[in-house]
């Protein structure tokens, strides 16, 4: 696997990969799935970071944080210098609906893992709040994580339906985010699915929703 990674880096080019934002693990499967060799993943991540290629990991799992080799890898003042770890970002999918994910770690366990990475290991972290299963639940997730996440990525539930969310709750939610983000270090990423959801609402509210979403995005320009 390491040889394949090295060959792919040479074939594509390190500069091209960096310009594209680095390597992302992974939308299609969980990189810390119990069936995956987490030690091999750690070595691949090291190879990428050693070449100054940013690495972003998205997972639902938390058990890998108890793996001794991963703990050594993340610990400050170990064989992995801080200047490598600055290019590492780790996020957790947190929707707040444990009943929809009976085989995954609970919301609280994921939040605790996020806190450990952010506060103890000083790793850049993010929350993938996608999909929003309910406005209330999404609001609670944000309240519990915005101080321990460097970013929160927000997306509407698929498929997009006009009656998916109450339009007044949806509007109140995005206005609250707009007002919150101005004073936070945590960056909020509004996914395109939020715009698609806003476009399903009727009347003048549609344009008000889109205007607020635009305001949030412009904060980070």
Task: Annotate each PLM feature.
Residues 164-221:
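C-terminal accessory extensions appended to soluble enzyme cores
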């Amino acid at each position: 696997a390491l040889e394949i990674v090295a060959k792919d880096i040479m074939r594509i080019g390190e500069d091209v990969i960096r310009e594209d934002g680095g390597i992302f693990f992974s939308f299609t499967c969980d990189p810390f799935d119990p069936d995956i060799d987490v030690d091999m993943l750690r070595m691949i991540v090291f190879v990428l970071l050693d070449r100054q290629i940013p690495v972003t990991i998205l997972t639902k799992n938390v058990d890998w944080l108890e793996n001794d080799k991963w703990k050594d890898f993340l610990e400050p003042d170990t064989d992995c210098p801080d200047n490598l770890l600055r290019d590492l970002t780790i996020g957790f999918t947190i929707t707040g609906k444990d009943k929809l994910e009976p085989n995954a770690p609970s919301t609280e366990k994921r939040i605790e893992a996020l806190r450990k990475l952010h506060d103890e290991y000083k790793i850049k972290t993010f929350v993938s709040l996608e999909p929003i299963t309910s406005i209330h639940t999404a609001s609670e997730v944000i309240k519990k994580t915005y101080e321990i996440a460097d970013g929160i990525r927000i997306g509407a539930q698929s498929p997009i339906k006009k009656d998916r969310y109450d339009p007044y709750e949806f509007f109140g939610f995005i206005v609250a985010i707009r007002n919150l983000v101005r004073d936070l270090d945590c960056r909020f990423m509004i996914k395109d699915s939020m715009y698609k959801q806003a476009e399903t609402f009727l009347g003048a509210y549609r344009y008000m929703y889109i205007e607020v979403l635009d305001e949030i995005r412009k904060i980070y320009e």
